[in-house]
């Protein structure tokens, strides 16, 4: 039994590693500090057109942490974009690197996309709630929902986002046109 479990684990790690190696040489990310919200915008040079809005993927940025991957929710998929709150460890180091050289380009591996997105088109009213950096998921859903509406649509969308400071909301408001053009 232990041999089967070990084999499955080794296979999983091998597949993930091969995906990272495949995407790493051809992919760069631009790091942009979002000082008002203490976050980093990470924009990849390659798209993931097959990813659903609100999906998550594992990022590998060897110049920040050589042997670690971390899961983050995509804000958009063409190009792939993440907004990552600076907390501790990797995210703090990522924010520091972005602040030291805004617009810095780094080699980046990406593995994913993962996640199941709820279907919202069959309802008269859609209400999306988010708190803090959890907005990356609901923002991507809202932009995708808006793009799928036609002129005669009777559906409505309520978007509720709780933030600690007004600065946090500027992360998306000031970049709304860019993100909404790229989110679907």
Residue spans of the language-model regions?
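Alpha-helix termini
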Residues: 148-151, 181-183
């Amino acid at each position: 039994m232990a041999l089967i479990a070990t084999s499955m684990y080794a296979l999983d790690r091998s597949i993930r590693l091969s995906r990272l190696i495949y995407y790493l040489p051809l992919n760069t990310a631009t790091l942009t500090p979002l000082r008002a919200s203490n976050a980093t915008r990470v924009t990849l040079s390659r798209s993931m057109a097959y990813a659903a809005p609100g999906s998550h993927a594992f990022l590998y940025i060897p110049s920040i942490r050589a042997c670690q991957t971390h899961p983050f929710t995509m804000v958009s998929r063409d190009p792939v974009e993440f907004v990552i709150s600076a907390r501790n460890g990797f995210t703090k180091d990522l924010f520091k690197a972005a602040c030291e050289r805004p617009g810095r380009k780094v080699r980046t591996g990406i593995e994913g996309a993962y996640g199941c997105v709820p279907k919202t088109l069959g309802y008269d009213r859609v209400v999306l709630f988010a708190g803090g950096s959890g907005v990356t998921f609901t923002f991507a859903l809202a932009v995708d929902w808006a793009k799928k509406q036609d002129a005669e649509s009777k559906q409505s969308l309520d978007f509720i986002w709780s933030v600690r400071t007004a600065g946090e909301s500027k992360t998306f408001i000031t970049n709304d046109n860019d993100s909404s053009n790229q989110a679907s």
